């Protein structure tokens, strides 16, 4: 298990293809925290840039509906992102544990995320990767928070959108048509609500609206269907 100075690692919460997440105690204040690190021992410049980006954007947002970042620690050739631990699990995991949620509870979740997105957009931030894995819910309080601002964008004051993207960013199954880079249109706050719509569809039906193992076919579905 990873060792980080000043923190006592308690358990591993997540082991993904790109990141590892741990629950820990900050030793000085005896405060519970969550720590996210990169899987790659020698991350690329772009991976490091995205890691710094999620800290830089989130730390300047005074919004209760996002996971608060505490610090970005140096860790060998990489970083460790230290965040608040509010006792949440991913919405993806929560739905697997509760496959018969009432419509009222589902609507409560979606309304909370909608309010968080509204606050984000009031702060000129577009998340660009809304999906069940990036929405945390506390099983006891039902409070919802957003995580992972690694590809989020802060809009300049003079603009309401990001120019037509040259590279594809986001998760294919939840990607807005504008994020495909094939629409000759900029990206604005509606991209996040498009992804939230797909997320709500998945919560209601238990499946995604577009199902394909072919990336190009999925892109076409988002654009044309």
Region roles according to the model:
Residues 42-60:
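AlphaC helix of the eukaryotic protein kinase fold
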Residues 205-208:
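Structural helix C-cap motif within protein kinase domains
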């Amino acid at each position: 298990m990873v060792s980080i100075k000043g923190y006592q690692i308690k358990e591993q919460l997540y082991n993904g293809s790109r990141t590892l997440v741990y629950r820990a105690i900050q030793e000085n204040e005896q405060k519970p925290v969550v720590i996210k690190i990169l899987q790659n021992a020698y991350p690329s410049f772009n991976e490091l840039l995205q890691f710094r980006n999620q800290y830089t954007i989130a730390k300047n947002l005074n919004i209760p509906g996002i996971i608060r970042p505490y610090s970005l620690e140096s860790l060998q050739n990489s970083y460790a992102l230290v965040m608040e631990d509010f006792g949440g699990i991913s919405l993806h995991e929560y739905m697997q544990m509760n496959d018969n949620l009432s419509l009222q509870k589902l609507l409560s979740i979606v309304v909370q995320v909608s309010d968080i997105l509204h606050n984000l957009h009031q702060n000129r931030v577009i998340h660009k990767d809304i999906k069940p894995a990036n929405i945390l819910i506390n099983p006891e309080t039902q409070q919802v928070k957003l995580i992972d601002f690694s590809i989020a964008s802060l809009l300049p004051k003079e603009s309401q959108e990001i120019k037509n993207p040259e590279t594809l960013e986001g998760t294919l199954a939840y990607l807005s048509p504008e994020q495909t880079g094939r629409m000759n249109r900029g990206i604005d706050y509606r991209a996040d609500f498009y992804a939230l719509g797909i997320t709500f569809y998945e919560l209601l039906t238990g499946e995604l609206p577009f199902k394909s193992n072919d990336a190009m076919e999925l892109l076409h579905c988002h654009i044309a269907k």
